Swiss-Prot record:
UniProt-recorded name of the protein: Protein translocase subunit SecE
Membrane topology: Single-pass membrane protein
Subunit structure, as described in the record: Component of the Sec protein translocase complex. Heterotrimer consisting of SecY (alpha), SecG (beta) and SecE (gamma) subunits. The heterotrimers can form oligomers, although 1 heterotrimer is thought to be able to translocate proteins. Interacts with the ribosome. May interact with SecDF, and other proteins may be involved.
Signal peptide positions (record): none
Family named by the database record: Belongs to the SecE/SEC61-gamma family.
Residue ranges of the TM segments: 33-53
Any one GO MF annotation of this record: protein transmembrane transporter activity
HAMAP family, A to Z: SecE
GO biological process: intracellular protein transmembrane transport; protein secretion; protein targeting
Keywords linked to the UniProt accession: Cell membrane, Membrane, Protein transport, Translocation, Transmembrane, Transmembrane helix, Transport
Stated role: Essential subunit of the Sec protein translocation channel SecYEG. Clamps together the 2 halves of SecY. May contact the channel plug during translocation.
Gene that encodes the chain: secE
Length: 57
């Protein structure tokens, strides 16, 4: 395990990284929000189906 090599790798990545533009940030936020919404909706649908089935929740 070469700590100096690892630190140099991290510094190189940070130098290449840049702050996203407002348009990129907005698009990523919308996609992440839609994903969170869909996962929540799927969970709600599963809960609703399980509560209507006999022996469910």
């Amino acid at each position: 395990m070469d700590v100096k090599y690892d630190l140099n790798s991290y510094v190189r990545v940070l130098k290449l990284a840049s702050t996203p533009s407002w348009q990129e940030f907005s698009q990523i936020s919308k996609i992440a929000g839609a994903g969170i919404f869909l996962v929540g909706l799927l969970g709600f649908i599963i809960f609703a189906v399980m509560s209507f089935l006999p022996g469910g929740v």
